[in-house]
């Protein structure tokens, strides 16, 4: 019997290799991942997939930043409480201050420490228990 699929996650990063690597890791843990190379694509995916339960976004991207995405989410009534995790290779104190104000769940420095990320996700979304009926 296949394991039930866990929550839908949206991964936003202009580095598509990073998105694919993270998606592979998280799908191996049972999550369903959508990837977006930009804020524009991320917003489109959020509209198309209302069951997305969490966003993991890079902080710095060429067209629009992760902070811009989070601000848009917080202004959108149906998505204002959507949990967001931010990743960054170089966040400064001003970024951290903005992220705290925007009620970000966590900030991970790149390269992402996968064990800690999985702990965070498993605490937020406990793995479904699969019960096997005995004979």
Predicted features, each with a name:
Residues 44, 67-80:
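Short amphipathic alpha-helix used as the core "switch/output" element in two-component signaling
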Residues 68, 80, 91-107, 119:
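Alpha4 helix (beta4-alpha4-beta5 surface) of REC/receiver domains from two-component response regulators
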Residues 112-121:
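C-terminal output helix
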């Amino acid at each position: 019997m296949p394991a039930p699929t866990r929550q839908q996650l949206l991964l936003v990063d202009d580095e598509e290799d990073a998105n694919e690597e993270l998606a592979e890791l998280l799908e191996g843990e049972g999550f369903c991942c959508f990837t977006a190379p930009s804020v524009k694509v991320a917003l489109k995916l959020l509209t198309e997939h209302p069951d997305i339960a969490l966003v993991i976004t890079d902080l710095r991207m060429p067209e629009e930043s992760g902070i811009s995405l989070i601000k848009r989410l917080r202004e959108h009534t149906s998505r204002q409480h959507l949990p967001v995790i931010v990743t960054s290779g170089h966040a400064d104190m001003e970024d951290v201050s903005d992220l705290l104000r925007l009620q970000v769940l966590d900030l991970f420095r790149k390269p992402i420490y996968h064990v800690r990320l999985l702990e965070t996700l498993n605490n937020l979304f406990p793995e479904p228990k699969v019960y096997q009926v005995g004979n």
